[in-house]
Amino acid sequence: MQNLFSGLIKASRRSLYFPFSLGHFANDFVPCSVVVLAPAIALEMGLNPMEVGLLLTLHSLGSALGYFPSGLMADSVRNRGNLLMLTFWWVGLGYLIASWAPGFWSLAFLFALAGCGDAAWHPLATAILVQADPQNRGQALGFHAIGGTLSAVIGPVIVGFLLASMDWRETLHWIILPTLLVGILFLQIRKWVPEQPERKAISKEDFQHLWKSWTKKTGLLIICLISSYHMSLVALMSMIPLYLREFHGLSSAITGFAFGMMVLFGAFMQPLMGRFSDRVGRRRVIVFGIATAAVCAFMIPVLENFGLLMMIIIFLLVGVGLLEGIRSSVLAAAVEYTGSREGTTLGFAFTLMDGLGAFGALLAGWAAGIQFSHAFLLAGILCTFSLILCFSVSLRS
């Protein structure tokens, strides 16, 4: 046993894939579970679908504020291990305080504040990984994404079972424990993170270069692609727990399990699709994922008319899994477009995804308020728009 543990430690020292994937899992565990907590919060506070969508949107918008500053620090701070370690305590303590929120607006504010800590992790960790393995950016981002996607699988399942025996506030107290425990582990792991050979303080010229890159036609098209892609993913995912609970009458435990399985596919597809896009090009992989997800989304109202619940769950699983699966390819395409300042570029891309992309939850909540199946039609329309943009922009392999 001691030899096995020593071997794991040595392997972790050689590669940051596992510790960073573990860190991603721990940091995302609570934020990914909020969507399953939402029906219980709505029941206690008397929220309608539109207000649930607004809560999820504000949660993501607040989180998005942490991405870009973190990206800047990823490119300029010498010792990034300490910053990574601090994110766990920010997230854990932040959501603990949020569990005591008395009303909707205080809860939305505290969720957003806690989410900033989770957001800060992403540009820091991903910048370190793509700088360490520049020839396999898609694969590196995919391995990092496994942890986050697994948290979106395991978190909702655990939350679903916990909600069967306690309220959402007590549930929140339990699910912050993995974050705090990994925060303790990172007191040691932070020492494994290589320091940057030299400080690369971002200058006025760097900002001008980034501004010039992103305001060109190609840059603007990529911005629209990233935003619409993530809006379609958020629109598809945000209403699924409420849809299964309220419309189909499934229990919290079954809802959490079904939602977890829907993103399990994406957990294992991200490194595979990322590596595949490293070999055959970003566009082919992204087009395949978005096109298939669009078909799945448009099929939900049809299947609903026939009362085929199991088929609905299968189509949602495929749609969510493939949209999650191409995330690393989309991020790698953004890094390759600018060609430098990986942390800043990734921070900008994450801001677009969780900032502008967060409006997918608000729009889906509005559509679901009319009829639940309309939320999935909206996701299909957003996928179609993303598909058009993908054919309009040149993506390097």
Task: Give, region by region, the residue ranges found by the protein language model.
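A late C-terminal transmembrane helix in Major Facilitator Superfamily
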Residues: S340-I370
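Extracytoplasmic gate region of multi-pass secondary transporters
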Residues: V34-V35, T218-L264
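Helix-loop-helix hairpin linking two adjacent transmembrane segments in secondary transporters
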Residues: H144-K191
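Intracellular juxtamembrane helix-capping segments at the cytosolic ends
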Residues: A120-D133, E324-T338
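Conserved MFS/SLC helix-loop-helix module at the cytosolic interface between two early adjacent transmembrane helices
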Residues: L65-P102, S277-V280
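C-terminal transmembrane helical hairpin of 12-TM major facilitator-type secondary transporters
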Residues: R283-V330
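Juxtamembrane intracellular "pre-TM" segments in multi-pass secondary transporters
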Residues: M1-A11, V193-I222
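Cytoplasmic helix-loop-helix junction between adjacent transmembrane helices
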Residues: L110-G148
